[in-house]
Amino acid sequence: WNRGDKSEYEFVGRRLASMGYITAVPNYRLYPEVQYPDFLEDGAQSIAHLKKELQKPEYKNLNPAQQYVLMGHSAGAYNAAMLALDPRWLNAAGLEHQTSVQGLIGLAGAYNIYPIKDTDVQPVFNHPDYPPKSQPIDYAGSRNVPALLLAPQSDTLVSIERNTKALHQALQSAGNQSKVESIEGTDHITLIGTLSPLLFFKGSTTKPIDQFMRELHQKNNLSAANPEQG
């Protein structure tokens, strides 16, 4: 929420595209320019813009889906989870939440972070006066969005127990489909790095992501571009 730019994650878009999936990697405004919930509104507007763009004739041959899988890492996984589970943000952007989101992929996500100990993150959520109902875990029972939650083998920045495992358990308790996978040999940073050719020697996130996406494709008839050859 206070650092990062989409240009740093071009490798993620390229990797997912090579797997056959139309992929967009958007920016969102950062603290101190904004606080919660402005970055969620940015994310919802990005999805609305993407939907409009994909309706243009030049994308027709890609057969783009009208339903989206939201994916993010760390703070980005928080954003993706909130947009997937809390209908307010997409509805406010003019989208039908129920039919717009078909899946969630979170990597080392921050889903249940109160009370916040990181002094860099505290002002983003107006510590100690946290806004109510502002964590993904609060919406675990709001609707059935299949979730794949990927965790590193070890994480000193975001507690796996308090976040990934807690959200997984909350989703399952609410009757929702959720799967957790721990990626061997990774930490908080290298987990997303496994999508880069430079870290292919690490445990792979591509296999569980691809399997999850293909299961959604079969279930919901999601459209994907043909995988690149080679």
Region spans (language model):
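Acidic beta-to-alpha connecting loop that harbors the catalytic carboxylate
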Residues: 153-156, 185-187
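Short beta-strand/loop motif that positions the catalytic acidic residue
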Residues: 143, 149-155
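Mobile cap/lid helix-loop segments that gate and shape the active-site cleft of serine hydrolases
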Residues: 102, 106-139, 145
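Primarily recognizes the serine-hydrolase "nucleophile elbow" in alpha/beta-hydrolase
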Residues: 45-119
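Short amphipathic alpha-helix adjacent to the substrate-entry channel of hydrolases
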Residues: 5-25
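Conserved alpha/beta-hydrolase "acid-adjacent" motif
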Residues: 156-165
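Short beta-to-alpha linker loops that shape the active-site pocket of alpha/beta-hydrolase fold enzymes
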Residues: 22, 27-31, 110, 186
